Amino acid sequence: MSSMTLFILFVSIIALLFLFINLIFAPHNPKNWTGKSINWVKLSNSGKTLKLLILSINRKVNCGWSNYSGIVISQKIYESIIGNRGSKSALLSVKEQRVYGSCTNNLVLRCTLVGLEISYQAKIPSNSINFKRNFSTLESKLNPSYISGFVDGEGSFMLTIIKDNKYKLGWRVVCRFVISLHKKDLSLLNKIKEFFDVGNVFLMTKDSAQYRVESLKGLDLIINHFDKYPLITKKQADYKLFKMAHNLIKNKSHLTKEGLLELVAIKAVINNGLNNDLSIAFPGINTILRPDTSLPQILNPFWLSGFVDAEGCFSVVVFKSKTSKLGEAVKLSFILTQSNRDEYLIKSLIEYLGCGNTSLDPRGTIDFKVTNFSSIKDIIVPFFIKYPLKGNKNLDFTDFCEVVRLMENKSHLTKEGLDQIKKIRNRMNTNRK
């Protein structure tokens, strides 16, 4: 045997020996991590393959960590089908991240990371969740029925008639579709603009913003939407009048005396009616009757989600209580307030949701309220997880869910838990900056 052959054989034996030692003692073998390394024991819940794994590179704002390297994978599954895999939580839906075992150079990542999601804090039945939606990593476009529900609460169909000597008849006539919100909901207004792909968003004051459409072509698109996805509050009458006015302007009828008078007659019964200037300028105007509206019926849950984003409230109240050991107790409420002209619609929510009650206010409004804790936990919270809010109010809902979780765990009966609830309450609704 030549010296070269002996050398190759020797090198091969050394290489095999080194590989064997490396497999036994190297840091990537969890059974032998000691000292400054993590003393790794195989997790009791490791075993079956994961239901879904995706790279977690782009995270939502609510996420508890950033994964710039892309070596962390995400898993979303339900507690009912989770088997031995994942974190056992009292909550239904858990957002979980695991690390590929091949990432041996970063020992810090050799653990299970659990982060916050909007739906994380709510304990709800598995069949109440939209399973497919949980796997989406992209912000979906607004649902058309959500848009109609939101506009039923916050939208305005405006007919403006202004004195203007530039026009032959001395009056300028414009139709506008407008949604005005606090600037905290600027992102929602931009989503609505993106949905319609017409109009503009303006910052009106330091605290308010507005989405506005007034071009004839743009209003055609707006009208097409609401013809297909109708309003169901009494606002549908204003919409029908608005549509009549828009058609007159499209046909240039506003440039004739007869057409202008017809538009003034519409203006007299839409929204707040004629202002003082118009009442003086057109004293003998023959007004028209407001259109009849169909009996309201909630056919799409996304409509209710949009309507609640506009008009709903998630309330946490801490009040004095003689029966509580701490001297204080917590009351949760889900509230929807509307003009009593929509009394039939608001009362129909009791049957639609299967909970709550209504009360008329002397000031001309009607309230729908859910205060029963079980109804809030088992009906209200699951509904808005499945049909999520899209505006700033979703932050209030997330906080509301956290309080529900604390109360379900009886934390409100301890001083620490009650203090935590007070802290959450103090950042909600009008206190949110």
Curated annotation (Swiss-Prot):
UniProt cross-references to Gene3D superfamilies, sorted A to Z: Homing endonucleases
SUPFAM superfamilies given in the database record: Homing endonucleases (SSF55608)
Lineage: superkingdom: Eukaryota
Name by which UniProt lists this protein: Uncharacterized 49.1 kDa protein in ND3 intron
Keyword set includes Mitochondrion: yes
Compartments where located: Mitochondrion
Pfam families associated with the record: LAGLIDADG_1
Keywords for the protein's UniProt record, in alphabetical order: Mitochondrion
Primary location class: mitochondrion
GO CC term (a single one): mitochondrion
Record field: transmembrane: none
GO MF, any single term: endonuclease activity
